[in-house]
Curated annotation (Swiss-Prot):
Needed cofactors: Ni(2+)
Domain of life of the native organism: Bacteria
Record protein name field: Ureidoglycolate lyase
GO molecular function: ureidoglycolate hydrolase activity; ureidoglycolate lyase activity
Gene Ontology biological process: allantoin catabolic process; purine nucleobase catabolic process
Gene name linked to the record: allA
Described purpose of this protein according to its UniProt entry: Catalyzes the catabolism of the allantoin degradation intermediate (S)-ureidoglycolate, generating urea and glyoxylate. Involved in the utilization of allantoin as nitrogen source.
InterPro entries xref list: RmlC_Cupin_sf, UAH_cupin, Ureidogly_lyase, Ureidogly_lyase_bac, Ureidoglycolate_lyase_dom_sf
EC number(s) given by UniProt: 4.3.2.3
Pathway the protein acts in: Nitrogen metabolism; (S)-allantoin degradation
């Protein structure tokens, strides 16, 4: 099956999480007017007994064509990825309770200046780079195991 890759924007991505970007977002000045602060762009969630982690993930490019055959989710916290070197990247997401609901399966491509924050329990493809090795600032939770993985029928990404 083919899965069309759509441009990433907050309106079409909102059911799955937050788009982290400055374009068309409100800000206020800090540090004597030298800094524009784009405040509270994503809601980070972790359970009380856990803690929030900030990491850097170095992702390798996926082999072409990109084929999706499994999704994962994190029921105990959100997970955010922001590319650090301006590279576009692809995210694949689906809603669903115990298993991914394939009628909600979507793929998006960022513009290289956007990150994503997956809501708790949103099914998504494991992180990968699109065209070149990419470092991602990653914000997620530390604590016990927090990853459910499900196989899905194979889908090949289709770039418009």
């Amino acid at each position: 099956m083919k899965l069309e890759v759509l441009p990433l924007d907050q309106k079409t991505f909102s059911a799955y999480g937050d788009v982290i970007e400055t374009q068309e977002r409100d800000f206020f000045h800090i540090n004597n007017g030298l800094v524009e602060r784009y405040h509270d762009l994503a809601k980070v969630e972790v359970l009380e007994q856990d803690r929030t982690l900030i990491s850097i993930n170095r992702a390798q490019p996926a082999a072409m064509p990109i084929v999706v055959h499994e999704l994962e989710r994190h029921p105990l916290g959100t997970q955010a990825f922001v590319p650090m070197n301006g590279e576009a990247f692809v995210v694949i997401v689906a809603l669903g309770d115990d298993k991914p609901d394939l009628s909600t399966l979507r793929a998006f491509i960022s513009n290289g200046r956007q990150g994503v924050n997956y809501h708790r329990n949103v099914w998504h493809h494991p992180l990968f780079a699109w065209q070149t090795v990419t470092d991602f600032l990653t914000v997620d939770r530390g604590g016990s195991d927090n990853c459910d993985v499900e196989s899905i029928p194979t889908h090949e990404l289709c770039f418009a």
